[in-house]
Swiss-Prot record:
It comes from Thermoplasma volcanium (strain ATCC 51530 / DSM 4299 / JCM 9571 / NBRC 15438 / GSS1). GO terms for molecular function: structural constituent of ribosome. GO terms for biological process: translation. Belongs to the eukaryotic ribosomal protein eL39 family. InterPro entries: Ribosomal_eL39, Ribosomal_eL39_CS, Ribosomal_eL39_dom_sf. HAMAP family: Ribosomal_eL39 (MF_00629). It comes from the Archaea. This is Large ribosomal subunit protein eL39. GO terms for cellular component: ribonucleoprotein complex; ribosome. Keywords: Ribonucleoprotein, Ribosomal protein.
Amino acid sequence: MSRNKELGRKIRLMKKVKQNRRVPGWVMMRTARKVTQNPLRRNWRRGNLKI
């Protein structure tokens, strides 16, 4: 991907980066470990972004 990106694409990429994090520990404690995995997790090589 090129170094110079449009602002809209950059914002969408940043949103996907933020979504690709693990569930915080305090969320697991608050939900009594019912929520332990993030369904939006994606591997950078295997998952394709449709942006």
